[in-house]
Design a protein with these regions (language model features):
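Domain-level recognition of soluble alpha/beta enzyme cores
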Residues: 124-159
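Glycine-rich phosphate-binding loop signature in dinucleotide/nucleotide-binding domains
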Residues: 44-46, 97-102
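Active-site-proximal alpha-helix that buttresses catalytic centers in soluble enzyme cores
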Residues: 1-80, 85, 89, 125-127, ...
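Short, glycine/serine-rich, charged loops/turns that create anion-binding
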Residues: 11, 56-58, 111, 140, ...
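Non-catalytic, charged low-complexity extensions flanking SF2 helicase motor domains
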Residues: 175-203
């Protein structure tokens, strides 16, 4: 099994005097979101073995902040190809990974991140807000075999859904969902049954599971 974590960069600082989209840094809110997601990914039992990030400053800062918060120790590489990339181009970067890693986090942009998630699970509309993370499990032994439609979406969460006291409850819910999806994939592989239709997961609201949702961020 290979696991892909698609992490959209955190909210960027539009007021930063950079004069260059590539150099735009994270806003304070973006840093906070990246820290939340770094801790959550580790709590959800999927700390990445390796990371790939866009060369944009906001993406590199997102990875660095999330890795520090989550205690990730795996190596990371910067890929210029992930900046203004197509979903297919990012997929090629993933396929080029070496098989000693089972979980890889990919830090990128919109609409590429949501497009790649949809491509991997075989279709469906997926929306990734800033600093949102999508976990996709692919029942293969080699990254080279990761292909469109072969993945199963285990979860998709924005940072606004994560309150500090909600981590444990969410972890239990996610563990159950992951186990159920794995069993479904394994059963389908054994009997050659058609895969489940792609689905859009129910969105969790900003600020916690009981709070109203927030607006999507505009930038990529």
């Amino acid at each position: 099994m290979k696991t892909i974590l698609l992490l959209r960069h955190g909210k960027s600082d539009w007021d930063a005097d950079t004069g260059d989209d590539h150099a735009r840094p994270l806003a304070t809110r973006g840093q906070k979101g990246a820290r939340k997601m770094g801790r959550f990914i580790t709590t959800a039992r999927v700390p990445p073995d390796r990371a790939i990030t866009s060369s944009a400053v906001r993406a590199r800062e997102t990875l660095a902040t999330a890795a520090e918060a989550g205690g990730w120790t795996g190596p990371a590489r910067v890929a210029d190809a992930l900046y203004e990339a197509t979903p297919e181009a990012v997929l090629r970067e993933i396929q080029a990974e070496t098989d000693d890693a089972d979980t890889v986090v990919v830090v990128g942009h919109e609409p590429t991140s949501s497009g790649l998630a949809s491509l991997l699970v075989g279709g469906g509309r997926i929306e990734m807000k800033t600093a949102a993370v999508a976990r996709i499990d692919v029942p293969v032994e080699s990254w080279a075999d990761v292909a469109p439609g072969r993945g199963a979406l285990a979860f998709l969460l924005p940072p606004g859904a994560l309150r500090p006291n909600a981590y444990r409850k969410l972890k239990k819910t996610i563990d159950k969902a992951i186990d159920a999806r794995k069993k479904a994939v394994e059963k389908a592989e054994k009997v050659g049954a058609p895969k489940e239709k792609p689905y859009k997961p129910a969105s969790l609201p900003r600020g916690g599971v009981d709070a109203p949702g927030g607006p999507a961020d505009a930038q990529g």
